[in-house]
Amino acid sequence: MERERLIDIVARILRRSGLKVARVELRGGCFDLVASGLFTLLFIKVVTNIDTVTPEQAEDLKRLAKLFKATPMIVGVRTKNSEIEEGVIYERFGIYALNPATLYRVLIEGELPAIFAERGGLYVRINGELLKKLREKHGYSVGELASLLGVSRKSLLNYERNEQAVSLEVALRMEELFDEPIAEPIDVLRAKVDVELKPAEPETPLEQEVFEKLKELGMGVVKVKRAPFNALSREDEVTILTGIDEKKTRSTVRRAEMVAEVGRIINTGGLFVLEKSKMEVVSEVPLIPKESLKEIKDVDELIELIEGLKREIRKSI
């Protein structure tokens, strides 16, 4: 399946579920779609082959998710070795990966998957406490149940302590034996993100100037390499998607438009700082010269500058 068609399918599933969706068209970007609802915020990377996601893209995707208390997700149709199975969760760099059919079942049908793929096959996590209660209720010793399931006593005890995943084959035997569901669903919409938010490391002299000024204003700055913006600048509840360019180009304008689209979905403002530029607004994202940023005294003044420029452009429309 072509990637563009796949992105369109995923976007339609998201919209059908009632989420607001923005598309980001950036070569090599860490996410392609951002979707939000009342209790849901997703940053999604869409690829045909989930093994083509790079470690750098994954780290940026996880940073965004952690900063916005969102869920990162990869949607694809195959790995380098096989098709992605419906109803099965895969994982790449600590991010859940699934196919569009599974995403549909989660968002539209409210059905959370329980099966995940790892080297060696398909597995589930089970409720170990429930397994122990069922074993005791049916009068099985550890050895007897282990023998019935075809596993070692040690493995069975690990299952009961929630210390070991269970192969799908063994889990099905358990559920058939006890006539009760034991597998724990995987809440792919509430995934925990494990990533370190390192201090921003500038790649250009202009980035260094901008980052230093933002830090001087009391903002935390997190560098994001594979997104329409260069960094996330944050102070308390204020977050600014911050773009940096030497001068205004077609690429700058397109990036600003994408920042505006993303900002509308996640309720966050944007700002582009250029080496030299007149003050203007592109799709409600202000473009300002670095000299104007240097004159700012605090975060409140920066926000007022951004909002003031947006008000001016609205009046002129």
Curated annotation (Swiss-Prot):
> Which keywords belong to this entry?
DNA-binding, Transcription, Transcription regulation
Presence of keyword Transcription: yes
Feature: DNA-binding region: 142-161
For this protein, the record's InterPro entries field holds: Arc_TR_HTH (IPR020886), Cro/C1-type_HTH (IPR001387), Lambda_DNA-bd_dom_sf (IPR010982), Restrct_endonuc-II-like (IPR011335)
Which Pfam families does the record match to this protein?
A: HTH_3
CDD domains the record matches: HTH_XRE (cd00093)
Domain HTH cro/C1-type, by residue range, is: 131-189
What name appears for this protein in its UniProt entry? Putative HTH-type transcriptional regulatory protein TGAM_1316
Gene Ontology MF, one = DNA binding
* Keyword Transmembrane part of the UniProt annotation: no
Q: Which domain of life is it from?
A: Archaea
